[in-house]
């Protein structure tokens, strides 16, 4: 019995030893298999490492990670080494208005923007916080301006605001930037001008294709870059990336683009042809009086007649007529409608403030490319007003008026006749001949080149307008109404 028990114990012990040996062998086998598997994985990684992309001589990109789940997660920086991000040269808040998009005029809409100047571009953000956001969807809405080939200039005539300059890009986009702080806007103007001057004047400067790829808001490769990395040979990848990197500077491509541009420019119709067909029309405001009258087949602009008629209908007895300013935004709206040659009814409720109508009329005369009193007549009218004898002064004035071009003569006559009706009701509107002379003198006549005698000229301008108004009947007495 004891011997059987001993055998059983020995057998059990042997079994346990056998199990331990088997387990050890199994573990050893598993470890070997794991090492083999790891070795295979390492070899697989080595095979992937061999298919690297050569961009520049002696430089090798990082191997493509195997931990990405699909090709869409392989971002551009895994294939193309990122270009150096240009250093931020200047940033801050300015007032911005986009007035043209691709050559198409836009309504001016001012807004405060956080502006960043870096390298060859300007970026407009809603505020400084948006610039710091890494979210691609947020940054996708950022407006960027390529300064290569752009033009910058001061634009006083584009806005009633002070210190405004304009940036025009080669793509036809136009932006106005403004600040009430003089030294700040001057600093911005000089910084942007310096950035433009550093860039080539050729719009195709630099490697545009690669530059656009880097600026793209998408984190994925372009569609033509979605290729099977296992099947593509290394030399094919190298060749593809070489073409991508150097395509913008390829001589044959440049010659082909130049040839197409030359053909396009040579076939483009002239400005005169477009104007004759009515596709391009000069604006009413800011044009030459002769041009406006010639287009309307008249010697007095239609807009001038409309304004005078409206004022005489409902504004002769309004206090401060022509002296009080109307709402500038409404005046600009009226100006826009006139320039677009849309239907205009000054009896409409939106023009019920008569000061808006008078303000628009004064703006029309003020913005003429040549004043109502032509530049060539300015000195002659000044010499006439200096004469001491009143009769001699009237005769000289009458002689000068007769020699004016028909559009200037007829428009001047209808305007001063209208102003005499304003003076006739001076007891109600409180506008004397002297007041109207001060208002219309600098508007209707000025020297072509102001040489420092601005104050002296202003005195003569007021006196000439006042004298023409006072002696209207005698100056135009020999003419039929």
Swiss-Prot record:
Q: What is its main location?
A: cytoplasm
Q: Domain of life here? A: Eukaryota
One Pfam assignment: RhoGAP
Q: Name one GO biological process term.
A: signal transduction
Q: What residues does the PH domain cover?
A: 87-197
Keyword annotations for this protein? Cytoplasm, GTPase activation, Membrane, Phosphoprotein
Chain's role = GTPase activator for the Rho-type GTPases by converting them to an inactive GDP-bound state. Has activity toward RAC1. Overexpression results in an increase in actin stress fibers and cell contraction.
Q: What is this protein called?
A: Rho GTPase-activating protein 15
The organism's lineage is: Eukaryota, Metazoa, Chordata, Craniata, Vertebrata
């Amino acid at each position: 019995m004891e011997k059987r028990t001993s055998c059983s114990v020995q057998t059990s012990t042997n079994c346990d030893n056998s199990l331990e040996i088997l387990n050890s062998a199994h573990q050893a086998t598993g470890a070997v298999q794991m090492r083999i598997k790891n070795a295979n994985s390492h070899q697989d990684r080595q095979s992937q490492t061999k298919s690297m992309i050569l961009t520049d001589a002696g430089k090798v990109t990082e191997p493509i990670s195997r931990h990405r789940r699909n090709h869409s997660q392989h971002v551009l920086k895994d294939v193309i080494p990122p270009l150096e991000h240009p250093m931020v040269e200047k940033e801050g808040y300015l007032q911005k208005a986009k007035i043209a998009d691709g050559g198409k005029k836009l309504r001016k809409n001012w807004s405060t923007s956080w502006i960043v100047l870096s390298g060859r571009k300007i970026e407009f953000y809603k505020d400084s916080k948006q610039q710091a956001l890494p979210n691609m969807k947020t940054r996708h809405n950022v407006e960027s301006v390529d300064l290569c080939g752009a033009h910058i200039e001061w634009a006083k005539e584009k806005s009633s605001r002070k210190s405004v300059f304009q940036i025009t890009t080669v793509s036809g986009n136009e932006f106005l930037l403004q600040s009430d702080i003089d030294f700040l806007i001057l600093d911005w103007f000089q910084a942007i001008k310096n950035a433009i001057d550093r860039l080539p004047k050729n719009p195709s400067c630099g490697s545009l294709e690669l530059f656009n790829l880097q600026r793209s808001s998408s984190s994925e490769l372009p569609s033509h870059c979605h290729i099977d990395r296992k099947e593509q040979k290394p030399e094919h990848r190298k060749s593809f990336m070489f073409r991508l990197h150097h395509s913008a500077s390829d001589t044959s491509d440049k010659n082909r683009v130049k040839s197409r541009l030359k053909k396009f420019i040579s076939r483009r119709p002239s400005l005169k042809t477009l104007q004759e067909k009515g596709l391009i029309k000069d604006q009413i405001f800011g044009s030459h009086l002769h041009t406006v009258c010639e287009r309307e087949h008249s010697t007095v602009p239609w807009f001038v007649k409309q304004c005078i008629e409206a004022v005489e209908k409902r504004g002769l007895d309004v206090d401060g007529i022509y002296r009080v300013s109307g709402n500038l935004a409404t005046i600009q709206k009226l100006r826009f409608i006139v320039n677009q040659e849309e239907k205009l009814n000054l009896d409409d409720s939106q023009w019920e403030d008569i000061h808006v109508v008078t303000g628009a009329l004064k703006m029309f005369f003020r913005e003429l490319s040549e004043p109502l009193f032509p530049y060539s007549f300015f000195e002659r009218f000044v010499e006439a007003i200096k004469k001491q004898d009143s009769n001699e002064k009237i005769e000289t004035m009458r002689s000068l008026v007769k020699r004016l071009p028909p559009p200037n003569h007829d428009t001047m006559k209808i305007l001063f006749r209208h102003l005499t009706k304003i003076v006739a009701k001076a007891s109600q509107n409180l506008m004397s001949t002297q007041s109207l002379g001060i208002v219309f003198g600098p508007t209707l006549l000025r020297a072509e080149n102001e040489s420092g005698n601005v104050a002296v000229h202003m005195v003569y301008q007021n006196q000439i307008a006042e004298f023409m108004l006072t002696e209207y009947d005698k100056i135009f007495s020999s003419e039929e109404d």
